């Protein structure tokens, strides 16, 4: 939604300014929201992929009109593979075209005063404050993350959106609307091919060269210092007396500022990212996500869909025969974090 995306940026600036004033910010520049935007990944389609050039252009325009300071435009083939130099150049030139040829960056907040945009902006501010209040009532963001509240809200919204797409309520050009005829299907586009074994070998060779040329004693000392700072932050013994607690509270404050500094110092001595992460894992442990599944959100949007009703009937028949619903393994490979598709299927 082009206008909604512009309004999001405007609402974010208003919220940031209001919140910073609440913290009694002394420097006026602290009231300025600095943002980096990236065009959508999940809006890109494998079907009729050249349409993605237009999608990315319009999404980039929304970010520019919204006042972003930094922008990344996705390549049109990223729904299929890593981008090629050809597709990356189109993505880069999209920004140059909007900036240089169209002059979109010449005016600050060009939609300011528009009745539509002002109303949408204020509505988003109110809705965002409701979400912030919900998080505060949950005990703050850390507690909300532990309870998967933001994650749940995101996945509920994604399921609702996907149901609207699958039911045809929300059109996706080239996918569920205005699909090309068989003889007009876009020809196969060139894709980037990656030799994973070669990439692995190159990385292992690079690490071997790195370790051979560094001061191992200095590296281990830096990692040891990182663990010590992390250990102070992690310590929490309720049996300690108040004086000891006060001393450790001061140490924790220092450690809070020093953790990043120690990590940077370790990197300066050529400790690897894995070694730095491993040192922190030694103290904090490894995070384990709490699995949960949302139910009923998708079905609400698909209640009148005949294909969905047939699927439900098939599941009921299976459950009657086997005493349980069917189980399907959804395996999301890789570590890029793009799990929307897997979550939607689940």
Where are these regions (language model features)?
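Flexible, glycine-rich loop/tail regions that form catalytic "lids" or insertion modules at the edges
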Residues: 85, 93-96, 100-234, 252-309
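Short beta-alpha connecting loops at secondary-structure transitions
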Residues: 1, 37-50, 56, 71-86, ...
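Gly/Pro-rich turn-and-neighbor structural signature
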Residues: 1-51, 133
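Glycine-rich phosphate/diphosphate-binding loops that line cofactor/substrate pockets in enzymes
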Residues: 232-236, 252-253, 312-326
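Glycine-rich phosphate/diphosphate-binding loop of Rossmann-like nucleotide-binding domains
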Residues: 332-344
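Short acidic, glycine/serine/threonine-rich loops at helix termini
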Residues: 2-9, 44-50, 73-76, 82-86, ...
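Structured alpha-helical segments in the cores of large, soluble enzyme domains
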Residues: 12-26, 54-67, 90-102
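Compositionally biased, intrinsically disordered low-complexity segments enriched
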Residues: 235-251
